[in-house]
Regions:
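Active-site neighborhoods and metal-handling regions in enzymes and metal-associated proteins
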Residues: 1-173
Length: 173
């Protein structure tokens, strides 16, 4: 879990800082069941969400779900990344910063395993794989990243996460 404004690097050390009004909250939650691992992330804001923040949230949610919905068996990680680029370029957001070299991954026995969803990934996606899509946009002092997870079926991706809320969640202090 990270909260604050501006700096959402995964590698930051823990802090005693208290949650404050207008902080962005980013949570990445993992689990393990029957030797399989997975994770999902969600965001919220401590305070009222602005119209601009809601617009960004909605666009990131739409890009994420459209990318995952486009997955079919036989695609490579690069094919999925190409779909992500096409969806992102259709929005006001465009592509995220250079941190978006990888926007997703598989999971199973390990939390992060092939295929990587990246521009250079030649790894092939097969029916039965679990795929995570999580493009990360850092803007307006916050992080906008909603990780959605699906199992790949012969007909495409079937979401196995409860989709992120349509409205950017607010925690009123």
């Amino acid at each position: 879990m990270r909260f604050g404004r501006e700096d959402f690097a995964y590698s930051l050390p823990p802090s005693d800082r208290a949650l404050a009004k207008d902080d962005f909250i980013w949570v990445d939650i993992g689990c393990c069941m029957l030797a399989s691992t997975s994770d999902v992330n969600r965001i919220a804001k401590a305070g009222r969400v602005t119209d601009e923040e809601q617009s960004i949230y909605t666009q990131v949610r739409n890009i994420t779900t459209a990318t995952l919905s486009a997955i079919r068996p036989g695609m490579t990680g690069a094919d999925v990344y190409g779909a992500f680029e096409a969806f992102a370029k259709q929005t006001e957001l465009g592509l995220p910063s250079a941190t978006a070299s990888r926007i997703g991954h598989g999971s199973g026995r390990n939390l992060t395993e092939p295929p990587s969803i990246a521009a250079t990934s030649k790894e092939v996606i097969h029916e039965g794989m679990i795929i995570h899509v999580e493009p990360k946009y850092e803007m307006c002092g916050g992080v906008f990243q909603l990780e959605e997870v699906a199992v790949v079926t012969k007909n495409g991706a079937e979401f196995i996460t409860t989709l992120s809320a349509e409205r950017f969640p607010e925690i009123l202090l």
